[in-house]
Amino acid sequence: MPGGLEKTCHQCISKIASNACFVVVLCAFLALPLSMTFIGMKFLEDCPIQPLIPLYLLVGGIVGTLKVSLLLYDSTRMRRLLSKAVVIDDDDDDEYPWRQNAHRYYIHLLLSLFLFLWFILGNYWVFSVYLPDFLPPFQQPQDYCDKTLYLFAVGVLALSHTVLVLLLLCSGCVYLCSRWRLAADED
C-alpha cells in the first residue's frame, strides 16, 4: 500500500474510532453478544435436535463480548490520547499504532477470524434443521428446538448477514473512491 494511502487510511480510522458516536454505537452493539450469551446459557439443553445451536450462541456471545470490549478499550484509549492533544510526529515510530502494538492487532485479527468461522458454523447448524418442531413431538421427544432459542439464532444470523453485506458494500465504495481519487491525482 502506498505510504500516502496508508497514512490516509490511518487518519480516517483514527477519526472514526475516536468519535464519541462510535463509542456509543459499540456500547449499543455490546447488547447483541451479551444477549447471545444469555440466551445460549438459558436454553442450553432445550434444542436436542441440534444441540450446537445454544453452544453457537453461548460461545459466539462470549467471544463477541470480548471483541467488542477490546474495541471499546482501544477506542476510549485513543479518545484519551487525543484529548491530551498528543501530536504524533511524521517520523515517529508510533505513527501507526498497530505496528507498535502488534500483539493487540493479532488478537483482534484472531478474534475476528474465529468469529467469522463460528458464524459459518452457526449458519450450518441453524439452517440444517430449518424450522424444527418447537414443541416436543409425542413420538420422538428429541426432535424439537425451543422456539425462542431457534428464532433468536435465526435473527442473529439475519442481522449478521445484513451487517456483513453492508460492510462489503461500504468497503467496495471506499475502494472505488480511493482508486478514482488516486487516478484523478495522477492526471
From Swiss-Prot:
It is found in: Membrane. GO terms for cellular component: membrane. Keywords: Membrane, Transmembrane, Transmembrane helix. The keyword DNA-binding does not apply. It is a multi-pass membrane protein. This is Transmembrane protein 272. The chain crosses the membrane at residues 21-41, 52-72, 107-127, 149-169. Disulfide bonds: none annotated. The lineage of its organism: Eukaryota, Metazoa, Chordata, Craniata, Vertebrata. The keyword Endoplasmic reticulum does not apply. Its main location: membrane. It comes from Homo sapiens. Signal peptide: none annotated.
